[in-house]
């Protein structure tokens, strides 16, 4: 498999034009409330919260595209975009520290 140059990754990553009617850049979704047909669908979305929108503060297709792009560029497994610097610091510390640290 041919290695993709960094410049190409920067241009292509996080974009799925054929999922968006051929439009290159993903649309900007601004949402706080997400509706579901029933509670079963809501529960399903909550268990898959990092891949599906269930509450606007936890991600929209726009933030998912950003997270995918950053992970791809950094050769990481996954990225989580947060709403503030304090929340990103907290997530980082809570991921690596135990209660007696």
Residue ranges and their predicted role:
Residues 1-29:
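Short conserved active-site loop signatures built around small residues
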Residues 9, 27-28, 78-80, 101:
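Structural motif
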Residues 95-101:
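Conserved PLP-anchoring active-site segment centered on the Schiff-base-forming lysine
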Residues 27-32, 44:
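A short glycine-rich, His/Asp/Glu-containing loop-to-beta-strand
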Residues 38-87:
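Conserved N-terminal alpha-helix of the aminotransferase class I/II PLP-enzyme fold
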Residues 15, 30-34, 57-59:
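Pocket-edge structural micro-motifs
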Residues 18, 35-39:
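Short, acidic Gly/Pro/Ser/Thr-rich loop/turn segments
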């Amino acid at each position: 498999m041919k290695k993709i140059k960094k410049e190409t990754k920067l241009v292509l990553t996080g974009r799925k034009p054929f999922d968006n009617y051929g439009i290159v850049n993903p649309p900007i979704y601004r949402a706080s409330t997400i509706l579901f047909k029933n509670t079963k669908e809501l529960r399903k979305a909550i268990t898959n919260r990092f891949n599906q929108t269930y509450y606007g503060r936890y991600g929209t297709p726009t933030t998912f595209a950003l997270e995918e792009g950053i992970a791809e560029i950094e050769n990481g497994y996954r990225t989580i975009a947060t709403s503030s610097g304090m929340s990103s610091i907290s997530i980082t510390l809570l991921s690596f520290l135990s209660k007696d640290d």
